[in-house]
Amino acid sequence: MSSSYSSRAEKYDLISCKDLTWDLSRSHLTTQYKSFYMCFDDGSFGYLQIAYGNLGLLVKVTPLGWTYYPAKTEKNVEPIVNSSTYLYRSMKISKDRYSVDVQKHFMHFNSSTREWHIVIEGVYDLKIKTEDSGFSLVDFGQNDSSSRMEHKIFPINTVEGTVTAHGREKKLTGVAVYVGALFFREKFTNLGHTWQNSILFDKSKKSILTCLHYFPRDPSQPFRSQASLTLDGKLIAVLLDNEYSTKGAAQVDGIRYLLPEQIHRILSGQTFDGKPVRVELSAELEELDSITDVLKIFPKWAKDIVSIWAGLPFVFVWLQHITAEVFIDNEHVATLSGCYYLEQTCVHLPQTC
């Protein structure tokens, strides 16, 4: 079984940290989240997110999610995948709208120093500094007058702090990618049946490739894709002309969703100084590192709300080593090689199934 998709777009904006406020003023259906994907120097990996959802009918919630994947060299140590969900009244927003507290958890941001302090109580206590500029896209840069989603991404951030895992606290250093999103006017799970988010952290920790693909529920709607390329600590291109293909179809026992066995991507665009850039990567996907039945980790009171809002969500994560080849002005300029994080979120079966 194989499939292929392509996207063509050109609209994006470069942004600064001043653009990272929370926007909770909309009266209609809204989902907003701020996330960090973190590659640590000891080979471990982590993710954290604080979100806000206006689900309609006066129901507003504040979900939190976090993971910690130990280094592959740590044998027989299980990853941590967890979440908590609170009613919106537990979420306190700062006057400048950059920072939030949710009971004993918090995500504080100083836009002047470009520094974050994030605590997931009992798990993470992290200081993160944004080192370079970011970019934003509305509807993945495509000409969609409905304007139903916006993403803001800052690929280069440094991180230090601690994690408490399986009863043991340890210090961490590394790099992180910030991904923020805002979905509005309708349930975000009406917009697509599958999202695939991936990040390649070169072993130098100074070159990073980000990719986000969105597969629409309505087959007549366009496939949406965006990527970015950072070399030597500088964001040099946002890539919106992308080809994506898969081979194979694996299925986990008891789960209805089909997963790719091989992926191939050609990501294209222009550098900020106008040179054509192309990134190619191919990989056979290895054993899954985690499978999360999202409804199972929500409290009982939230399950019915979440199932209406988010379908039957499962999150599949692979962590493995891959390489990608970078071409600028038709010349090979770099090979990115390192930790590859691939996260596929399935919420509905495709209409063709």
Swiss-Prot record:
Keywords on record: Cytoplasm, Nucleus
Q: Which InterPro entries match?
A: Ceramide-binding_SVF1, Svf1-like_C, Svf1-like_N
Entry keyword Protein transport: no
Location of this chain's protein in the cell: Cytoplasm; Nucleus
GO cellular component, alphabetical, reads: cytoplasm; cytosol; membrane; nucleus
Q: Name one GO biological process term.
A: sphingolipid biosynthetic process
Principal localization reads: cytoplasm
A Pfam family recorded for this sequence: Svf1
Recorded superkingdom:
Eukaryota
Question: What family is reported?
Answer: Belongs to the SVF1 family.
Q: Please identify the protein, giving its name as recorded.
A: Survival factor 2
- Provide the organism lineage as a comma list: Eukaryota, Fungi, Dikarya, Ascomycota, Taphrinomycotina
